[in-house]
Regions:
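Periplasmic c-type cytochrome electron-transfer domains
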Residues: 1-11, 20-51, 55-58, 62-299
Length: 299
């Protein structure tokens, strides 16, 4: 958008399956923009989550000078998801791209120069990582950040906002009501700030709904398909609860508990059953009964 003329200059399309854009930032020089979003594999049946079968978590790089999408890379690794990326920022020295991974309560720190160098080589057909399989498959390669990214556990719950002052990195826990500070490779200072949402069933349910660590390898949370307070991702998914081969649009969960039966075909008798089935068959998780009870309270 041209802010002086209040005019749209160009629309840039993210890859097919992109949803839930959460943050955009630029580097210090204004040459590139970085966008966090999810990348759904909605053409596949929902029978597993291994290696990002259903959802992957992405960073798209935009060439601002030429007004085009340069590349999309996955923040995930082959064995571990980086669910629900939220804020992205570039360090003041222009050396790092930092991403708040809200679903797994971590911060991903990427060497910016090495990332751009790796992408330039990959575009020329150079096998830049052991998993490289051609430029057209970069956005499907969970190994693209191998060796150039650090994943730092924060300690708080729901890391949605980050900031940097010099070499000091700050990360805010939305649900835990705290700020964590890292002056190196470890977040070792915690400061309580504001309200801890985990004191109530509704607050805990909200946190569980956004918590990918409940599920297998942290690839996705309930909020991956139902972002923005349990609404819809706008995609068609083929769930197995009513057979294969009949993809249907994701439903908003607003008032689902008050309007049984649930799912498009009414295959679930009520929302309580649907919540527990989702934990088992979409997150591929086994959780204490209190987790589903708290999710019910939130929804």
């Amino acid at each position: 958008i041209d802010t002086e003329k209040s005019k749209v200059i160009k629309r840039l399309l993210l890859p097919n399956g992109s949803t839930d854009v959460k943050s955009v930032t630029t580097d210090v020089t204004g040459e590139h923009a970085y966008v966090t979003h999810l990348l759904a594999r909605y053409q596949l049946p929902t029978n597993q989550v291994d290696r990002g079968w259903m959802y992957t978590n992405a960073l798209t790089i935009v060439d601002l000078k030429n007004e085009k999408v340069e590349a999309t890379v996955l923040l995930d690794t082959p064995q571990k998801g980086a669910a629900n990326p939220w804020q992205v920022m570039v360090s003041p020295d222009n050396k790092e791209i930092c991403v708040a991974l809200s679903g797994v309560h971590e911060v991903c720190r990427i060497d910016r120069a090495k990332l751009h160098d790796r992408l330039a080589q990959a575009k020329q057909g150079v096998a830049v990582t052991p998993s490289y399989n051609g430029w057209e498959n970069v956005m499907n390669d969970a190994g693209m950040l191998y060796g150039i990214a650090q994943y730092q556990p924060v300690g708080g719950k729901g890391i949605r906002a980050i900031a940097m002052n010099g070499k000091t990195l700050y990360a805010a826990g939305y649900f835990s009501g705290d700020i964590h500070v890292a002056k190196g490779d470890v977040f070792d200072v915690q400061r309580k700030l504001g309200n801890n949402m985990l004191a109530s069933a509704e607050g805990r349910g909200n946190m569980y709904f956004h918590d990918a660590t409940l599920g297998f390898q942290g690839w996705q949370s309930c909020a991956s398909c139902h972002p923005n307070d349990a609404r819809a991702d706008g995609l068609n998914w083929d769930l197995l609860n009513d057979g294969l081969g009949n993809p249907k649009n994701t439903k908003s969960l607003l008032l689902s508990h008050q309007t049984p039966p649930c799912m498009v075909t009414g295959i679930r008798a009520n929302a309580e059953i649907a919540v527990r089935s989702g934990i088992k068959y979409i997150l591929f998780a086994v959780t204490p009964p209190s987790v589903a009870d708290d999710m019910d309270a939130y929804l």
